[in-house]
């Protein structure tokens, strides 16, 4: 766990402002695990970003925002996409939630699809690893990321508040504006937020970008999002609803989709004309700024639209023996369009209805627990000349129970979950599949002393294959009929005969804390049978690499370390030292290394924090990844220097926050081994960032 140092509760998309150093670790109240009150009370591996720490780390993508946590990394696909990688696992093995319900986007379908969650609107982000993920599906073998944004007020605010923020990001010449308002009238609470972001092509290290330039072409982004929510509060609980929307347009770096313009079918259109259209975006201005040295030739862009409706009810003690009932219903209309130049390649659509209902029962002796049911119905389609996944209807039913038991210095936790997945390709283009999966976990935490705790857990998880793993290019049996996925410039071949993926996880941790410091270390292993892997076959068809979903045994082993300590004081400000490191290794039964794993990584930070200001210097480094997997490219070692300062000014009862930081101060060329585009798209170069916020 990390020591959390926050002086105030601020709007978390705004600047971090002044973070006060308090003695001892602060405990975050968990939303994702209803049984537990804080991160210190669970045997499960849990991390939470809140307050000033969240504001400091917030980025435009979810993966980049939480990449500072131990064991968590970012799988970028250009600056517009950042998917979380937890303990080496990603994609369908990591479940992204928004207020406890699935984000219901297409991020699990492909690495080029963004997670339809806006981190800059978050109040907190909770990351669960290990057995706790059973609450949200046995398929979340890697972990669960829950973004809590308060769009449905769970309590009546004491007074009306208005927060306005602005942020400038130097590397992308991007500007983000946010507004948030909350208030109450009698027993009704209200919430409103909105965000607008525009950025140009991102700058990278000298000579590392498009055609040897210092920028990545076609990486501009435009995003608008917001939500409107309300809740009615009564003696025994509340009921609330919210509507939210997301409209985003982002480009995939030039070079990442070479070969995709040769025609949508691998064996056809060998002399396909390249599109030569300009996009009405910030890309054009930025191209001119860099001398107009690159042109768009069928650049691939993704236009994302999502409309979401949420209903939530909490009832305290609805009947004898039940402490709390929690009900969640979410309706999502998601669509994104892959554009090549001005032409539509594929339109992805996902319409889903999901319900989740929990009962927290009263203690039975020393046993306390939660049980529930989760149901969903999703229609997914990919339409267009370049569509390579058939329309499918997916129905899911899940039953789960999680119990804990306290006995002296021991706390035990046990969970069980059963899921049934029906996946039905529309029109009979492939065989329908039904999967029954059963997952179980057992964990314990032992209090050695007031300062020392040791924890251990073991779980057995099962995951049903996903739609893209089963049905990508289904029915296209010859190379001439294979369809290239334009956004990734690859041919992706599914396997409708895939079996259930099974994993056995073991986790051992040691945690220490005192009034001025905290440290934790964990070691873990994941042993899979029927592990599903999108393997690079090494075959090239029509200039596109052929990747195939294959299945076999695999094993991951890893370790994490995290520590924070207050060294002393200087001019009434606390001097802090922060350390972190993690490593994971993965190998298939064939002896090949698992591709796109992060290398040995670490960070070291020196901080100085007072009541009204905060300063930091941080070095983050990654070793060379010389075990990239079969037919994959290795990456070099890298390091990054970040420095910054944050200040808070009071104007009566109102606060003004200002933050200034320099990220990648030495303009290093950084290529992440977790990125599918590491050969084409390095991470952003030197970036001078400025943020301002006003809290009324």
Where are these regions (language model features)?
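N-terminal periplasmic "start-of-domain" segments of outer-membrane beta-barrel proteins
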Residues: 25-57, 83, 91
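Extracytoplasmic beta-strand/coil segments of soluble accessory domains associated
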Residues: 63-105
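Short acidic/polar hinge/loop motifs at secondary-structure boundaries
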Residues: 102-129
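Periplasmic-side early beta-strands and strand-to-turn transitions of outer-membrane beta-barrels
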Residues: 159-163, 169, 176-302, 530, ...
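C-terminal beta-signal and adjacent terminal beta-strands/loops
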Residues: 205, 460-463, 529, 647-696
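Face-selective signature of the C-terminal outer-membrane beta-barrel domain
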Residues: 233, 238-246, 303-449, 453, ...
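Outer-membrane beta-barrel signature, preferentially recognizing the C-terminal barrel domain
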Residues: 290, 296-311, 318, 441, ...
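Gram-negative outer-membrane beta-barrel transporters
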Residues: 367-369, 410, 518-528, 545-628, ...
């Amino acid at each position: 766990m990390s020591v959390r140092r926050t002086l105030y509760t601020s709007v978390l998309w705004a600047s971090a402002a002044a973070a006060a150093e308090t003695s001892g670790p602060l405990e975050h109240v968990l939303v994702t695990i209803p049984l537990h009150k804080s991160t210190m009370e669970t045997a499960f591996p849990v991390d939470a970003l809140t307050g000033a720490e969240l504001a400091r780390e917030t980025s435009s993508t979810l993966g980049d925002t939480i990449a500072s946590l131990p064991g968590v990394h970012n799988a970028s696909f250009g600056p517009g996409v950042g998917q979380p990688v937890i303990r080496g696992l990603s994609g369908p093995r990591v479940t992204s939630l928004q207020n406890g319900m699935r984000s219901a986007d297409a991020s699990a379908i492909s690495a080029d699809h963004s997670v339809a969650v806006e981190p800059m609107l978050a109040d907190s982000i909770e990351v669960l690893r290990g057995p706790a993920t059973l609450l949200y599906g046995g398929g979340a073998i890697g972990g669960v990321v829950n973004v809590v944004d308060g769009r449905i007020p769970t309590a009546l605010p004491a007074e009306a508040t208005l927060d306005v923020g602005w942020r400038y990001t130097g590397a992308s010449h991007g500007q983000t504006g946010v507004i948030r308002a909350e208030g109450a009238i009698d027993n009704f609470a209200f919430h409103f937020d909105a965000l607008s972001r525009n950025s140009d092509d991102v700058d990278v290290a000298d000579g590392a970008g498009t055609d040897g330039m210092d920028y990545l072409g076609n990486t501009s982004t435009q995003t608008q999002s917001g939500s409107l929510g309300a809740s009615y509060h009564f003696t025994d609980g509340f009921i609330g609803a919210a509507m939210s929307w997301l409209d985003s347009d982002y480009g995939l770096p030039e070079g990442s989709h070479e070969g995709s313009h040769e025609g949508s079918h691998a064996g056809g259109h060998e002399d396909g004309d390249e599109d030569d259209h300009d996009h009405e975006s910030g890309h054009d201005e930025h191209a001119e700024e860099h001398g107009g040295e690159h042109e768009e030739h069928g650049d691939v862009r993704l236009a994302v639209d999502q409309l979401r409706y949420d209903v939530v009810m909490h009832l305290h003690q609805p009947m004898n023996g039940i402490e709390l009932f929690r009900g969640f219903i979410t309706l999502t209309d998601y669509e994104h369009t892959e554009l090549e130049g001005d032409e539509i390649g594929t339109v992805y659509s996902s319409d889903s209805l999901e319900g989740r209902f929990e009962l927290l029962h009263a203690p039975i002796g020393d046993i306390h627990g939660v049980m529930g049911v989760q149901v969903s119905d999703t229609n997914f389609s990919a339409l267009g000349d370049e569509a390579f996944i058939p329309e499918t209807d997916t129905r899911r039913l899940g039953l789960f129970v999680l119990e804990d038991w306290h006995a002296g210095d021991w706390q035990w936790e046990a969970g069980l979950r059963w899921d049934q997945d029906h996946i039905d390709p529309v029109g009979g283009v492939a065989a329908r599949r039904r999967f029954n999966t059963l997952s179980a976990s057992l964990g314990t935490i032992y209090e050695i002393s007031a300062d020392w705790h040791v924890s251990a857990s073991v779980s057995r998880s099962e995951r049903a294959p996903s739609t893209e793993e089963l049905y990508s290019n289904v029915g296209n049996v010859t190379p001439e009929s294979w369809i290239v996925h334009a956004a990734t410039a690859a041919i992706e071949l599914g396997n409708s005969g895939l079996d259930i993926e099974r994993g056995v996880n073991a986790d051992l941790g040691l945690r220490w804390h005192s009034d001025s410091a905290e440290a934790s270390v964990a070691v873990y292993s994941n042993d899979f049978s029927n592990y599903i892997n999108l393997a690079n076959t090494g075959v090239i068809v029509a200039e596109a690499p052929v990747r195939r979903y294959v299945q076999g045994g695999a094993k991951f082993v890893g370790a994490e370390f995290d520590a924070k300590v207050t060294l002393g004081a200087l001019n009434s400000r606390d001097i802090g030292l922060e350390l972190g490191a993690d490593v994971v290794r993965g190998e298939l039964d064939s002896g090949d290394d698992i591709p796109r794993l992060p290398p040995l990584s670490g960070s070291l930070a020196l901080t100085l924090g007072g009541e009204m200001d905060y300063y930091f210097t941080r070095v983050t480094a990654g070793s060379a990844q010389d075990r990239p997997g079969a037919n994959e490219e290795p990456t070099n070692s890298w390091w990054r220097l970040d420095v910054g300062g944050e200040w808070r000014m009071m104007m009566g009862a109102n606060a003004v926050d200002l933050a200034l930081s320099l990220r990648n101060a030495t303009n290093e060329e950084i290529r992440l081994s977790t990125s599918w585009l590491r050969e084409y798209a390095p991470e952003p170069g030197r970036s001078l960032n400025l943020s301002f916020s006003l809290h009324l």
